[in-house]
UniProtKB/Swiss-Prot annotation:
Protein name according to UniProt: Cell division protein FtsB
Protein's membrane topology: Single-pass type II membrane protein
Family the entry assigns: Belongs to the FtsB family.
A Gene Ontology BP annotation from the UniProt entry: FtsZ-dependent cytokinesis
Function description: Essential cell division protein. May link together the upstream cell division proteins, which are predominantly cytoplasmic, with the downstream cell division proteins, which are predominantly periplasmic.
Gene that this sequence comes from: ftsB
A Pfam family it matches: DivIC
Assembly description: Part of a complex composed of FtsB, FtsL and FtsQ.
Any one GO cellular component localisation term in the record: cell septum
Length: 93
């Protein structure tokens, strides 16, 4: 009977060791869980960025106002009979 108890205790100890420290054990599970969490956060940021870019693309495809705004800001274009003024901060003078 004692031998059986000792064998069962050793088996239980072996299983516990494998669970906590072995391959695919608790430590690796926690590391994988943290990595998944970080990847989800990165994916959320990228999804938000993609949605903004998609909205801008749709706006450029359908609306003339977006094209005009882009031309004014990026290319500094003006309409006929319009004057463009650039205000330079004091630090850049």
């Amino acid at each position: 009977m004692r031998v059986l108890v000792v064998v069962l205790a050793l088996l239980l100890g072996g299983f516990q060791y494998a669970f906590w420290f072995g391959q695919n054990g608790w430590n690796e599970y926690q590391q994988a869980k943290q990595e998944v969490s970080q990847l989800k956060e990165t994916n959320q940021k990228l999804t938000a960025r993609n949605q903004l870019i998609q909205a801008e693309i749709e706006d450029l495809k359908t609306g003339i106002n977006a094209l005009e705004e882009r031309a004014r800001l990026d290319r500094e274009m003006v309409k006929p009979d319009e004057t463009f003024y650039r205000i330079v901060p004091r630090e850049q003078r």
